[in-house]
Each structure stands twice: as C-alpha cells, then as structure tokens.
C-alpha cells in the first residue's frame, strides 16, 4: 500500500482513523480521451442482507455483482478518489491547495467484488438521498464485511464515517457510537451553524433556511481556487493522462 507523502508519517491504524477516500468517480477511456464521470447509481436499498444498486438504465443489481457490470462497460478503467484527512472537509470548503489536491488523487486498482461494492456505497452516501433506516442497515452490513486488504479497510472505514455523519446531520443522532466517528471539525461547524439558525429564528421569527448541507464534494472549492472540485478534477485527469494513458502531472497512487 503506497500512501501520499503527507500521510506517511502516521501509523497504519491512525491512517484509517483520520482519513477517508472521497469523491469516487469512474475513469473511462473513449478513443484517445480519458475522462471521469459519476457512477450510474440513482438509488441504493438493502434487502435480504444484501445491498442493491439501482442503476440509470432501470436495472437493480446486487452490489456484489457490480464488479461484473463495471468490467463489461465499454472503456471502463477503474475508479479515482481523493484521500482527505478529517480536518480537511469543513462541509463548506476543502482545506487543500491545488498542488496538495493533485497529490491526493488516487487511482483505485480494485480486484475484489467487495471493493467494487464499497466504492458504490461511498458514492451513494455522498451523492444520493438515503433514508435513516437504510443507513442503519448499511451500517450493519458493512460491519459484517470481511476486509483484509488496505483498500478494503479504507473504503469500509469511509463508509462507516459517512454513515455516522449523515445520521448526525440529517437525523440528529447523537449517540456516542455515532459521535465517535464524526470528525470534530464537522461537529463544530454544524453545531455553530445550527446555533446561529436558532438565534435568528428566536429574534426574527424566521424558519426559512436555504443553506442545505451535502456530503458531495463536487460543488466544494479548494482553498486557492475558484473552480468547483469536479471541474478541477476533470482538468487534472485530462492533463495527467497522455495518449498512452500514462500518469504525468499527478502522482499515480495505488492502494494495492
């Protein structure tokens, strides 16, 4: 397992506790052009102790068979993601410079069905509306998944963390096992934000709140860039791959 240089000083156990792999996208090749796109998931459900992915074409597939779906997709090269420390996502911006962000982009080389399943779950947790009971069922299923490889451990820990954040923000779940997985910076930001809203409502009798909270990083900005993250990533990936599909600008990082 090769980690970005900025993370190499931590013990392995610490890495899984304080970092996540976020903003997972598909990497695709068409002719000589390499690009990224969203996963084709529009919903996620849990039934019969299995995770089910609802795809754009109307089909519903068992999460464990998602690997075969991906491998049959024309031009599919794998997934990319971004390694973030807990202190770097404030729910408003990403506390990375453009240079730092490039070094955090990882090319996920996956082999196991479970790894594809976990990538799909991470994407769903960040981008899709998910019911509270579904979150609880997902949490229970992920706990039962046997993970041995570093990439699987990181993806599973990311799923557990995102589930806890969603439970905390959208369902006001403040049980200790939930709070233990919610990064302190998110707790601080969210509590201060809700306190300000309560104060405004108290004095001005206003219950309107247009500030919606989302875990998707696509519309977040980096510290020194006015671009949305998704636009930055598209540009970085385009620059990174030559016609022979070799990494140039960004440091290619494999978790295997």
Swiss-Prot record:
Primary place of residence?
virion
Q: Which keywords has UniProt assigned to this entry? A: Host cytoplasm, Host Golgi apparatus, Virion, Virion tegument
InterPro entries under this entry? Herpes_UL7 (IPR002600)
Q: Which is a Pfam family this sequence falls into? A: Herpes_UL7
Q: Which GO terms describe its cellular component?
A: host cell Golgi apparatus; viral tegument
Q: Where in the cell is it found?
A: Virion; Virion tegument; Host cytoplasm; Host Golgi apparatus
Q: Does the keyword Transmembrane helix apply?
A: no
Q: Describe its function.
A: Plays a critical role in cytoplasmic virus egress. Participates in the final step of tegumentation and envelope acquisition within the host cytoplasm.
Q: Which family does it belong to?
A: Belongs to the herpesviridae cytoplasmic envelopment protein 1 family.
In terms of HAMAP family, this protein maps to: HSV_CEP1 (MF_04038)
Full protein name: Cytoplasmic envelopment protein 1
The scientific name of the source species is Human herpesvirus 7 (strain JI)
Q: What gene does the UniProt entry assign to this protein? A: U75
């Amino acid at each position: 397992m090769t980690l970005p240089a900025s993370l190499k000083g931590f013990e392995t156990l610490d890495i899984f506790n304080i970092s996540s792999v976020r903003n997972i996208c598909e990497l695709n090749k068409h002719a000589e052009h390499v690009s990224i796109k969203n996963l084709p998931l529009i919903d996620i459900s849990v039934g019969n102790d299995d995770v089910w992915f609802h795809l754009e074409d109307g089909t519903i597939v068992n999460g464990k068979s998602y690997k075969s779906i991906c491998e049959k997709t024309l031009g599919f090269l794998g997934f990319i993601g971004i390694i973030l420390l807990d202190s770097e996502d404030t729910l408003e911006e990403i506390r990375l410079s453009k240079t730092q962000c490039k070094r955090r982009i990882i090319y996920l080389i996956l082999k196991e069905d479970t790894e594809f399943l976990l990538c799909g779950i991470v994407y769903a947790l960040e981008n899709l509306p998910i019911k509270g009971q579904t979150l609880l069922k997902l949490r229970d299923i992920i706990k039962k998944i046997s993970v041995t490889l570093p990439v699987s451990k990181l993806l599973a820990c990311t799923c557990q963390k995102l589930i806890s954040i969603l439970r905390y923000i959208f369902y006001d779940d403040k049980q200790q096992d939930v709070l233990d997985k919610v990064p302190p910076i998110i707790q601080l930001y969210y509590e201060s934000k809700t306190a300000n809203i309560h104060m405004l409502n108290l004095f001005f009798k206003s219950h309107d709140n247009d500030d919606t909270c989302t875990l998707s990083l696509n519309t977040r900005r980096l510290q020194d860039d006015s671009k949305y993250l998704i636009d930055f990533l598209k540009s970085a990936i385009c620059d990174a791959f030559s016609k022979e599909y070799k990494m140039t600008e960004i440091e290619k990082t494999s978790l295997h």
